[in-house]
Amino acid sequence: MQHTSSMARRRLLMAGGALGLAAAAGPLLTAPAQARATAAGPCTRVTDLGPGIEQFALMSALQVGDTVYIGSRNLEPTRVLAFHLPTRKVVAQTVLGVGHSIQALAADPTGRYLYAGILQKGDEGKPNLFRWDLTTPDKPAVGVGRTQDRDIRDLAVAPDGTVYAVGGIPGKAPALWRYDPGTGKVTELGVPDPKATLARAVAATDTTVFFGAGSTLGGGDGASKASLFAYDRAAGTFRNVTPPEMEKDPSLRDLLVVGDRLVVSTSGSTEPAKLAVMDLADLSSYSLTPTTGKVVKNLTANADTVYFATDTGLHSYSSATEVISPVAFDGDLGEIWGLDAVGGRLTVVSGYGFVGELDPATGRAVVTDLGEAGAPVIAQTAMGIAADHRYAYVGGNNGIARHDLRTGEVVNLRAPGEAKDSEVLDGVLYTGQYSSQGMWTYDPLKGGQPHQLADFPAEQNRPLDVCHDPVNALLLVGVQSDTEGGGSLWTYSTKTGEKAAHINPIDGTQLVRAVATRDGVAYLGGDNPTAQGPRGTIVAFDPVAGRELWRLDLPGSLTTGTAALAVRGRHLYGLTRKGGFFVVDLTIRRVVHTADHRAVCPGFAAMVTSRGVVYGVSDTTLFRFHPRTFALSTVVAEINGAWYSGPHVNADPRGRLYTMRGRNLVRVEDRPVI
């Protein structure tokens, strides 16, 4: 491959969005893309296209005095920034260095200490609760404790300075945790809801701690829905105080103590999210108001007005009239991770990487891009990947990086949530957006930003695999329902715009982890995140008629859940989540080959067919399968892609492969001798 000088000059730009932010978000990257042969031989060429997606991704924010503290997301190392509102500059930061994201921030009543709780992919045996002394911001935050629940999702500090934490770990019901700053001890106070899978909200008064849980992740299979418990600090006992109207929602999402009231919100699923205001003196006395959003979070208050964020923007709730109203804002706020009401103004922190200072009375706002203000713009872990002859796309949090394959220019596009998987058809990008965002699209010839193409039932919230069916001109998307269990197959016609959601096409427990297509038939690979029930079922499905054609149960050694599927000729290739490999002859509907590839593929994987060869990628290795013997060969060893939610590989129309090596996007041109 011959490189031009333009390929050596890579620029990272922020695409002009609804807020008109189009300034450079990072320094020039002058290192040229490198092509080199690998151990697989001279027929394999790897081109480094630079960082997949660079931004200051964030997951939490809290205003203390005149400074907003912001927790990072999927960046290494984890850190908290201090954004000074009067100067609109990042004036300090502290590196925590543990985990991948910071979702929980809370300040003690004096405003001196900021507590931060982290999320981890695996228990590192290190503190997951940190404290930063804001009087000496030049000194780093220190780890002060570790809960046995791996992830901390929310923190609250009682008036006496005692810290309470909630969160969870897969396979275990969440507990309420207490950190005593006087003794330095972390204590488990109990598990109030043994059927909950995650706790996301906590609030505390002098006498009571409120614990909000449910099953935002890992729903179904008997998991509980939204639950609210009051913990008596003196007696050490829990009491269920969940408003009955909220019990259908999958989870309590947020809690706020305002004077003598407790404000409670939920995440919605089959119904919209709800907001309740409860009397602290008599928790059976409350007002409850449905919203139009899928989630209500980031509760804050000014006098009798409660402000909150939903998936559609900002809203206010009047305690006097019990009326919810939108808060005017000229632009797209995206996914909101911080909201504070101070002095009649709102401070909004968006997942798009900006801080907005908003006057709710007039709708006027001042918006500051965090990259321009001094936040580090660095590579984050990646999600879906797609490419054509001109552009390659890498999904991230609240953004998609567009790589110009001719010039090397990289532009960050705005898209709320997460682009879990994507495809490019005739130059147009199509994505499956988590959570409950449906399908989005972007046409570079038309410019602008990505926009929603089609919505689907909100409970079918997690798209996992996007596939194109050229026979029926359909986009096929395999989906998981985090809250209800099971999943669905979405279809969208690129010709007519018609859409459909086929709920639980495998069974009531299995989600659709993978989708492949041949001759107008969709092949669905099942997976089951629960401990019970079948997993790994393969279903042949007519996506036009919306009906099953036949199904196949895999051999017992392969029933660990499907990770990926691909079709070559009459053969359906499949990988399981523990490295099991199988080939199905679609003409006789039978497994004709199996193998154990745990050595190179110990967990999640992705596959794609390119130039008549099926390729796969794991967390560690890019590999191919021989089309006649099905033997596995390594293409790129130790590729070690930095993925947020499982590896991806895709191909452009010329058959070149795109995946991640570390946090960099790479193009792999492989011409094996078959």
List the predicted regions and their residue ranges.
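A short helix->beta-strand "capping" segment at the edge of beta-propeller domains
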Residues: 38-54
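Blade-level signature of beta-propeller repeat domains, shared across WD40, Kelch, NHL, RCC1
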Residues: 643-674
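Surface loop/turn motifs at the tips and blade-to-blade linkers of beta-strand repeat domains
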Residues: 49-54, 94-98, 144-148, 190-194, ...
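Beta-strand-rich domains and repeat architectures in extracellular enzymes and scaffolds
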Residues: 49-78
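N-terminal secretory signal peptides
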Residues: 1-7, 15-34
